[in-house]
């Protein structure tokens, strides 16, 4: 099932990409619509396919120390690789808080000074059992494809927890969609002359 939703945060993040030569990391799978969207913009797009690399049990139940040791192999980067935009989509909802905190730290280290992390946090009571596919229809519109009719309880992360899970980053803007998703664009606190939030 597919539905289109407004995404003003993504529109803003895309408009602020340096042109040409911006670097974008998509943590989701390779989708032709997203590749086709970024190609005319002269963007270097890297597809991590992170949700396919990590199984459900590992995302939620892996021992923290083992998870942190495995993470560089699950989400490898080239030396000096940096990104102007990271598309996390709804993946944060499918990791335990400890596991996602480690992922967020790894991503933050790779954001350029003016870079941004785009993410979608479920605020409704339930969510699809597995992450959705997201396709960029236009800069301010996302198509969400639900892959599973089965639902599970959503983590419903409050704003304070979202802050704690992304040390060093702040959200100068967020948007609550009618489909039960809070959209965040998180950027380096230093870029906004703000101190990092305590963890």
Predicted regions and their residues:
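Class I (Rossmann-like) S-adenosyl-L-methionine-dependent methyltransferase catalytic domain
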Residues: 1-17, 24, 31-77, 116-199
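Hydrophobic adenine-recognition pocket in adenosine-nucleotide-binding enzymes
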Residues: 91
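Hydrophobic beta-strand segment of the Class I
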Residues: 86-87
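Residues at alpha-helix caps and immediate loop-helix transition turns in enzyme cores, especially N-
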Residues: 34, 99-100
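A short glycine-rich, Lys/Arg-flanked "PGG" loop and its adjoining helix->strand segment in the class I
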Residues: 101-113
